[in-house]
Amino acid sequence: MPSLSEAYRAHPVHVNHKHPDFNSLQELPESYNWTHLDDHTLIDSNNIMKESTTTVPVIDLNDPNASKLIGLACKTWGVYQVMNHGIPLSLLEDIQWLGQTLFSLPSHQKHKATRSPDGVSGYGIARISSFFPKLMWYEGFTIVGSPLDHFRELWPQDYTRFCDIVVQYDETMKKLAGTLMCLMLDSLGITKEDIKWAGSKAQFEKACAALQLNSYPSCPDPDHAMGLAPHTDSTFLTILSQNDISGLQVNREGSGWITVPPLQGGLVVNVGDLFHILSNGLYPSVLHRVLVNRTRQRFSVAYLYGPPSNVEICPHAKLIGPTKPPLYRSVTWNEYLGTKAKHFNKALSSVRLCTPINGLFDVNDSNKNSVQVG
């Protein structure tokens, strides 16, 4: 079975750039200056709280109506936050501490674990960087499988405790992701038994995942810098833990960019492209970006969750019929990563079969229209 790492190796990212020492920069370099930005102001958190229609839904997983609430959030937002999710606060603090410790290392030390162009694991810039003319005020560390080799380079004398945190975090996140997957499917009238690759225990034990540690250093000119440029995730879903520094924004039709405020103990869940496909477009993947702060450093940890890399994903049979044809063709995560590497945010459009027009479907449509996301 092809692994997620092999899928990334098949689509190398060639960006001839190494991170500067962000802390030493007193001015924003031209290569990081996004001068064309005209909507680059964080929405005031007080205004968000007053306007409930512009607040990302927060869902208590102990609520007996959690599945219904999640379905509504997925349909209308493509993103939601969860509380009472079962992940110990101490573990969330441990993984944040690991990220802060890693990104606080001297530049020469971090570069010992640099991700290779055809690799997925290690330290480096955002994989989406090649699609933009300017660089992002960002550094990341991706983990697929064991982090042992890279952590030995970073902490020769003390790597085991860092590895232990990653293993524990991965195990607990995989369980939570499976739970969220079941709730999202249930909201569509689909049971986990309806998913052939769910495994003998119907617990999605064969699912693939990657862990992404993100750092957004304080920036001398945040109004003209971009932490992470707008994109959707290729996943089924992405679970994000963030520190107390705002910056994550999601795009919602009619509202523009909406800030997702950090909640202590809360986790952000993004709908990804593969669930967009599985739901036949009912649950759109969310377009999101990250802005930076003048005086504070933002950290986040993303758990990128998807199917086994060679399993074909298509609109589920329960969601299609004579008046509801499939909008997307079958695609594996492995193949879709290649499509994403080539077409980026037009990847969904490239696997579309037909487009609804005034409530009807043009089955002869050949990817003529762009995908509306958010």
Swiss-Prot record:
The active site is at residue 298. One of its GO terms (molecular function) is gibberellin 3-beta-dioxygenase activity. Binds 1 Fe(2+) ion per subunit. It catalyses: gibberellin A20 + 2-oxoglutarate + O2 = gibberellin A1 + succinate + CO2. Keywords: Dioxygenase, Iron, Metal-binding, Oxidoreductase. Fe cation binds at residues 231, 233, 288. GO terms for biological process: gibberellin biosynthetic process. Its cofactor is L-ascorbate; Fe(2+). The keyword Iron applies. It holds the Pfam family 2OG-FeII_Oxy. Residues 206-307 form the Fe2OG dioxygenase domain. Its EC number is 1.14.11.15. Belongs to the iron/ascorbate-dependent oxidoreductase family. GA3OX subfamily. The Le gene controls the stem length trait studied by Gregor Mendel in 1866. Converts the inactive gibberellin (GA) precursors GA9 and GA20 in the bioactives gibberellins GA4 and GA1. Has a small activity on GA29, producing GA8. Unable to convert GA20 to GA5, GA5 to GA3 or GA12 to GA14. Involved in the production of bioactive GA for vegetative growth and development, but not for the 3-beta-hydroxylation of GA in developing seeds. This is Gibberellin 3-beta-dioxygenase 1. It comes from Pisum sativum (Garden pea).
